[in-house]
Amino acid sequence: MVIRTTHFFFLVFVSNLLIGCASNKSVGDGRNENLTKKKIMNSYPSDVLNANINISSFDGDLLITGQVPRQELVRLATVQANTLRNVREVFNYLQVMGEASFLSKTNDRFITSRIKSRLQDLNLFKKKKIHIVTEYGVVYLMGTLEREELEKTLALIKETNGVQEAISLVRQKK
């Protein structure tokens, strides 16, 4: 049993490393993620201790997910994100609830890994500008795709085991 548990945690660790390797983010995207999180944390430092705020950006779009203890922090996150330069649009999906458990976060990582693997197998992920974030089984898809690519990608995401919902924040190519 100890060996299986060790293997499980090793797989979780390796999958997290691989997810990071597949990022298409620019330096500006990473900077906006860090600045937004700092601004939110500095505004209400005592409340943020009980918060789980995740910020992802892609081509100027900023996605905020996670859990916060009060509704006011949801609004604050959007306000702070909108003060940054080079932010085209803010998508705030924060939820007022307790922080996600370790098991839930691990499951979300596995869902993201599974989706990326399936997209690569079908050559839908190759050289495409997309970013996938999973929170509580809800998959957020960011990037730029043509309509047909988007439909195929969303269908694949929705049929992936463990996915509760798929939310497209994709900008369609014309």
Regions found by a protein language model. Name each.
Residues V2-H7, V12-K174:
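N-terminal targeting leaders
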